[in-house]
Every structure is written in C-alpha cells, then in structure tokens.
Swiss-Prot record:
InterPro entries: UPF0114 (IPR005134), UPF0114_bac (IPR020761). The keyword Cell cycle does not apply. Belongs to the UPF0114 family. Signal peptide: none annotated. This is UPF0114 protein Shewana3_0644. PANTHER family: UPF0114 PROTEIN YQHA. Keywords: Cell membrane, Membrane, Transmembrane, Transmembrane helix. The keyword Membrane applies. It is a multi-pass membrane protein.
Amino acid sequence: MEKIFERLMYASRWIMAPIYLGLSLVLLGLGIKFFQEIFHILPIIFEMTEVDLVLVTLSLIDITLVGGLIVMVMFSGYENFVSQLDVGEDSEKLSWLGKLDSGSLKNKVAASIVAISSIHLLKIFMDVKNIDNDKIMWYLLIHITFVVSAFAMGYLDKMTRK
C-alpha cells in the first residue's frame, strides 16, 4: 500500500506539466501585446514627444522582462519539479538550463520582480505631475518592500548554502 501511495504521489508531479505549458500561452499573449504596441506607435512616432516615446519604450521593456520571467519559471520549474528537458545535442541549449535549483529560481524571480517594479516606478516618475502624492508614496513603499524582500531572500539563501 505504501509503495502504491508513493508512486502515485511521485507521478502527480506531472499535473504541473500542463500548467508550465499554459505559461507559454501567456508568453504568446505578451508577444501579441508587444507587437500591438509597436504597430500602434509606428504611424505616430514622428508626432510623439520624447517623454511619450520613453514611456512606450519602458512599457516594452516591462513586457520583455515579464516574458523573460515567464520563460525562466517555465523551464526551470519544469526541470526542478517535473522532468529534465531532453533537448538534443544538435539544438541550442540555454546555458542556465539544469543549473537553477528552487532557491536560485526564487532569487532570480525576486530580482526580476524588482526590475519590473523599477520600470513601473520610472514610468510613474516620468509622469509625476499627473499622479497624486499618495499614490506615489504607495508605489515607493511597495517597491521598497520588493527590494528588501529580494535582499532578504538572497541573504538567507547565501546563509543556508554555507
């Protein structure tokens, strides 16, 4: 009975596989939104102010960072919790594939969240005259919380590896 239970529990990790595959659909949606924004600004690029162009660029960078975060979670999560990715020797293999354990993944996700939050904060500062001071304060507090959390996670991970 114990063996059956353990095998069933071990096999249940495959429930995560479609979830990781579903993240690729989110990635596709981000790609569509990215190019939608590109096609939206191309006809009006010469009429845009420099500030508006920078804001659009920051939005595109934000989408790119979120996309990279999705790829990282998708691949390393699959490898850590489901099965190793079996890419052939003749195909390109990402250098970090198979090297991110769950602790490293948490640190990379935290760093990505801080980077994404920084982009949002920069967009807010670019449009500071149109945003209430209370909202700016909350954005700053949330960003500082992300930074402190990422630092604490990195520090704790470093302490546990010693």
